[in-house]
UniProtKB/Swiss-Prot annotation:
Lineage: Bacteria, Pseudomonadati, Pseudomonadota, Betaproteobacteria, Burkholderiales
InterPro entries: UPF0060 (IPR003844)
Topology of this chain in the membrane: Multi-pass membrane protein
Keyword vocabulary terms for this entry: Cell inner membrane, Cell membrane, Membrane, Transmembrane, Transmembrane helix
NCBIfam families referenced in this protein's UniProt entry, alphabetically: PRK02237.1
Places the protein is found: Cell inner membrane
Principal cellular location given in the protein's record: membrane
Name of the protein in its database record: UPF0060 membrane protein Bphyt_4776
Keyword Cell membrane in record: yes
PANTHER family: UPF0060 MEMBRANE PROTEIN YNFA (PTHR36116:SF1)
Assigned GO CC terms: plasma membrane
Length: 106
């Protein structure tokens, strides 16, 4: 559970770090959105270093959680209800994440 929570916090940091510049560019938000966006991306990079395995495996497993957080963001922030296809995609990516992240350590 601790691993999944760390992946989720990492994903939120990345989504926020990408969303704020997107808002600035796409919706004409303040240029000051770039400051917390950059800080959030720096936090994201630092959080990735806290995962206790090889970088490539961390990135692969993290990708599944990122998809889940992005779809949650779609629903909570963008106010767009996810489709059944979105839910199925999240389920498959989380299954892949679990296979990678929780494999037996030898």
């Amino acid at each position: 559970m601790k691993t999944f929570l760390l992946y989720a916090v990492t994903a939120v940091a990345e989504v926020v770090g990408c969303y704020l510049p997107w808002r600035w560019l796409k919706e004409g938000g303040s240029i000051w959105l770039l400051v917390p966006g950059a800080l959030s991306l720096a936090l994201f990079a630092w959080l990735l270093t806290l995962h206790g395995t090889a970088a490539g495996r961390v990135y692969a497993a993290y990708g599944g959680v990122y998809v889940a957080v992005a779809i949650a963001w779609l629903w909570c922030v963008d106010k767009v209800r996810p489709t059944l296809w979105d839910a199925a995609g999240v389920a498959f990516t989380l299954a892949g994440m679990a296979i990678i992240a929780f494999q037996p350590r030898v």
